[in-house]
């Protein structure tokens, strides 16, 4: 409650000279594990959700039970489109984590989850697995279609959004052409928004902080003005993070189509070294899902993103791999390297707002919505 009236409560603190703000909500976090809880709490986050990949549908109940009464923050998860495809098209069943971190294995040796167009029967099996997750309490549907652009048809995305709509749930989507150029980014969200308009269903644009972000933002704003429940999120970094074998990092896309150089844009998380095409090919043979940092846009764009109204912050935080023997008590200096957004996304928004004369209430709104 924000009010000028006299109020009372169980506890009173002296907040003179300070700002009282709600706990921050991170709707895009791929690691909801004890060894990362401290990192997120120190960044002001009190609610952590995995909405982009999510958990495997039949495993939703088990995912929640593993955390009930054990987590010092609020948590939730969407149902994973990618994992339903991995089970149906690749026979994958090695569910160690039940959610996002399992992608390190499901993407390792087989490619059906990414490249195979399902038959009608297989498509219905995929939807049935996702439906199980929605029935078990999945917040919505997470689709990483940008990693599966060859295998996922427009009809499949439409049916996903239709299924979520039956429960009043959202789809959160890594767009079909993300990362890409400004036209691809915009076309990717238009697929999702057209379905949302036709079906009247909610939709979240995952990390649209890519080339084309201005038009994506305008589309979101104009659709909300017309009453549609659609919104987007960004993280305050010019670089992203993903697996080395991501389809959009293939030379045909990253180098030839988008004009990037591996030597300038593709960095190994563990070593800090930049890849060449040759060293990438060599590492793909050894560790295809190795984490990398991807530089994709100019730093100056970050302030533009934080100025945009009606946008939420989602860290897109990554698991710390390998995570064997990591616990709540593991010293910070013993944690493996990862993208800094994992632990610093929300504090960075506050700093950039302060340094660039962006209203504090704008920053608080972005971080707590």
For the regions a language model picked out, list residue spans one by one.
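Histidine-rich, glycine-flanked metal-binding segment
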Residues: 1-21
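Divalent metal-coordination and catalytic microenvironments
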Residues: 17, 28, 44, 75, ...
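Histidine-centered catalytic micro-motifs
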Residues: 23-32, 145, 171-177
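Alpha-helical scaffold segments that flank or form the walls of functional sites
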Residues: 27-76, 93-97, 101-102, 108-109, ...
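Acidic-and-aromatic substrate-binding clefts and catalytic sites of carbohydrate-active enzymes
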Residues: 30, 53-57, 149-153, 179-184, ...
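Alpha-helix-loop-beta-strand connector modules within alpha/beta enzyme cores
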Residues: 69-75, 154-173, 195-198
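Active-site neighborhoods of metal-dependent hydrolases
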Residues: 79, 85-151, 189, 193-197, ...
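Short, well-structured alpha-helical segments that form the helix of a local strand-helix-strand
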Residues: 360-369
């Amino acid at each position: 409650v924000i009010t000028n009236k006299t109020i009372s409560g169980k506890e009173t603190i002296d907040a003179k000279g300070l700002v009282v703000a709600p706990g921050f909500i991170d709707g895009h976090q791929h690691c909801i594990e004890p060894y990362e809880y401290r990192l997120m709490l120190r960044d002001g986050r009190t609610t952590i959700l995995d909405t982009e990949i999510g958990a495997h549908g039949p495993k939703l109940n088990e995912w929640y039970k593993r955390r009930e009464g054990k987590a010092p923050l609020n948590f939730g998860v969407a149902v994973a489109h990618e994992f339903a495809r991995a089970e149906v098209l690749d026979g994958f069943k090695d569910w160690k984590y039940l959610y996002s971190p399992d992608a390190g294995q499901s993407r390792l040796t087989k490619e059906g989850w990414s490249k195979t167009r399902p038959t009608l029967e297989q498509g219905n099996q995929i939807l049935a697995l996702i439906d199980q997750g929605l029935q078990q309490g999945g917040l919505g549907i997470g689709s990483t279609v940008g990693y599966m652009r060859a295998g996922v048809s427009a009809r499949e995305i439409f049916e996903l959004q239709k299924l979520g709509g039956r429960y009043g749930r959202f789809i959160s989507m890594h767009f079909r052409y993300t990362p890409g150029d400004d036209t691809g980014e915009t076309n990717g969200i238009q697929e999702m928004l057209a379905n949302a308009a036709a079906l009247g269903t909610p939709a979240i644009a995952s990390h649209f902080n890519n080339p084309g972000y201005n038009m994506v933002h305008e589309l979101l704003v104009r659709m909300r003005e017309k009453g549609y429940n659609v919104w987007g999120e960004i993280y305050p970094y010019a670089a992203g993070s993903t697996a080395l074998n991501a389809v959009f990092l293939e030379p045909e896309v990253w180098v030839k189509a988008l004009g990037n150089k591996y030597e300038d844009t593709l960095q190994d998380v563990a070593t800090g070294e930049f890849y060449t095409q040759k060293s990438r090919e060599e590492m793909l043979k050894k560790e295809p899902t190795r984490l990398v940092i991807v530089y994709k846009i100019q730093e100056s764009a970050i302030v533009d993103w934080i100025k945009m109204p009606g946008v939420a912050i989602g860290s897109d935080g990554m698991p710390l791999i390998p995570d064997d023997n990591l616990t709540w008590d593991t010293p910070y200096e013993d944690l493996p390297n990862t993208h800094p957004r994992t632990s610093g996304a929300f504090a960075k928004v506050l700093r950039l707002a302060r340094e660039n004369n962006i209203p504090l209430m704008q920053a608080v709104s972005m971080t707590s919505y």
